[in-house]
Amino acid sequence: MPKVAVYNKEGATVGEITLSDAVFGAEVNPGLLHEVVQMYLANKRQGTADTKTRAEVSGGGRKPWRQKGTGRARHGSIRSPLWRKGGIVFGPHPREYGWSMPKKARRAALRQALSAKVKSGELIVVDKFELEAPKTREVATLLKNLKVDGSAFIVTAQEDVNIYKSARNIPGVRVNAARNLNAYDVLAASKLVFTQDAVAKVEEVLG
């Protein structure tokens, strides 16, 4: 079973925690992780890009000049795709890009993403972290003490409004509750910062 150090808010080691093999020690399947990341990215797309065909562009109902006798190329409309400001051929139109994977596959991908973070030393466990009121400086100090200098994903056992409000103004830092995790958010962060209670909650949900 994988083991990781437990730190306090000051960044000092205060113990060690043994993680569940089923959740944090799963074998990583790069193909599955790639597929689930593609799914989450596809589901984020708005799909609102739109262009006008020659039938939708304003104007062009009249033949610009007679067919023969002018010495110019023949044209039937100034909104042909050949013309400047003409219609677009095979351009994008609003569509739904999203798709879904089976729940079992998504949960397996989440276990593998967490396991990959443990193996690469990118999972940090804090014994306890609570705020009485929103304070961005407190979260920034915690990350500094833990030597987190890239993007970070802070995971709490339950929804914590104070921590969420404190971290949302720090670039690259996200906060979520243990039951709301997904593989994309886990893989996107340079470091995962879990509270001990959050580790127990994740093991309860995914174990």
UniProtKB/Swiss-Prot annotation:
What does this gene product do?
One of the primary rRNA binding proteins, this protein initially binds near the 5'-end of the 23S rRNA. It is important during the early stages of 50S assembly. It makes multiple contacts with different domains of the 23S rRNA in the assembled 50S subunit and ribosome. Forms part of the polypeptide exit tunnel.
Positions of region (Disordered): 47-77
Assembly and partners are described as: Part of the 50S ribosomal subunit.
**What name goes with this protein?**
Large ribosomal subunit protein uL4
Cross-referenced InterPro entries, in alphabetical order? Answer: Ribosomal_uL4, Ribosomal_uL4-like, Ribosomal_uL4_dom_sf
UniProt xrefs under PANTHER family? 50S RIBOSOMAL PROTEIN L4 (PTHR10746), LARGE RIBOSOMAL SUBUNIT PROTEIN UL4M (PTHR10746:SF6)
Comp. bias regions, Basic residues: 63-77
Which UniProt key words apply to this protein?
Ribonucleoprotein, Ribosomal protein, RNA-binding, rRNA-binding
Spell out the family assignment given in the record's similarity comment. Answer: Belongs to the universal ribosomal protein uL4 family.
Gene Ontology biological process terms in this record: translation
Recorded GO CC terms: ribonucleoprotein complex; ribosome
Q: Mind telling me which Pfam families this protein's record contains? A: Ribosomal_L4
Q: Has keyword Hydrolase? A: no
Q: Name one GO molecular function term.
A: structural constituent of ribosome
